[in-house]
Regions:
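Acidic, metal/ion-coordinating pockets
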Residues: 1-133
Length: 133
């Protein structure tokens, strides 16, 4: 619920732990997102999305980044405007207890690659696309 989410966000902030995907409100998301981390001169933009909240309503004013191509495209454009060298889109998606990703995941994966960023937090059988020029 809202109280648990706010507690978690407050705790992470107090410990200096960077986070993305859940926000206190729209202003919080606008200020913090995309999450840009710079290490050894490399600027990494982290994007984070989920398929849903397991049927639970997200109480206002909390924001959870849901998988939505239009929003993701806007976020990738924002990351590019921040001069990110690398864009990683962490996707909480897929079906449990299956060894191959469903077609909708394959299609979204291909679209993400075409947009410039792709990573997944779930190991499944997958194919690589060589993106080097």
């Amino acid at each position: 619920g809202k109280g648990t989410a706010i507690y978690t966000l407050d705790m992470m902030d107090s410990l200096g732990i960077a986070h993305c995907g859940v926000y206190r409100n729209k202003e919080d998301r606008n200020r913090r997102y995309p999450l840009l981390i710079e290490k050894k001169g490399v600027r990494i933009a982290l994007l984070n999305y989920t398929y849903g909240t397991n049927g639970r309503e997200v109480p206002a004013p909390l924001i959870v980044n849901l998988i939505d191509k239009e929003s993701i495209a806007e976020d990738i454009a924002d990351a590019k405007c921040m001069n990110a060298d690398v864009i990683i889109a962490c996707m909480h998606w897929g079906d449990e207890y299956v060894s191959l990703p469903p077609q909708r995941i394959k299609e979204l994966s291909r679209w993400l690659i075409e947009q410039g960023g792709f990573s997944t937090n779930d190991l499944s059988n997958f194919r690589f696309k060589n993106l080097s020029n």
